[in-house]
Amino acid sequence: MPNTSFSNCCARFLEDPLAAVKVLVPSVAIEIVLHKKLWQKTSLRDLTLYLAIVNTYWFATTLNLSFLETPLFCNCGRQRFNWLNKIEIVVGVLGLDLYCEWRKRIIDNNGFVDGVLARSIWIPATVTAIQAVYLLPTLNKKAKQIDRTGHEDEQFPKAHRAYIGFETVKVVGLAVAGLRFGRMLTL
């Protein structure tokens, strides 16, 4: 018999409007420790490798969970995308910190960071924040209404299309970042 109190607790957490903040704050705290103890002492090549890995992982999970396995029931999909968003917050904090340390080292050595690479790092993190703060709470509210009444609100398809559009932009940014950092490792 499944533990319903645990699943209810998880569902409440996922639907909590402050859940993103509850994930972000400890993620930033952990990343500060990692930054001070690990990233500042890591070689530039290793930072590039970690950035390639983080962006490739984020790209693969987002592509798989958002596009390849999308035909889901409303409640299952809602929980899955809420969990994915919380994981993306953690990965986004890690990726941004790695990028900032990498960029600092490149510039300190009179190097150049092109704008496309910079945007390909910042766009996925920004999209994740927009999804966590606005799109997911809106979609959660509309999905609950559909579950309750059985009728779709006219705004639900628009919000859903916006979410899909943002996911597409995020996947493109992650692909560009992963490919660019991966290419740097071959030079």
Provide a role label for each language-model segment:
Residues 2-18, 22-113, 150-153:
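Interfacial loop at the N-terminal end of multi-pass membrane proteins
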Residues 141-160:
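Acidic interhelical loop/turn segments
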Residues 50, 54-57, 87, 120-123, ...:
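Physicochemical signature of membrane-embedded alpha-helices that form the seven-helix bundle of GPCRs
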Residues 112-134:
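Short alpha-helical packing/oligomerization segments
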Residues 70, 128-146:
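Inner-leaflet juxtamembrane helices
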Residues 177-187:
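Juxtamembrane boundary at the C-terminal end of a transmembrane helix
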Residues 155-179:
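Preference for long, well-ordered alpha-helical segments
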Residues 106-107, 139-147, 185-186:
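Membrane-interfacial segments
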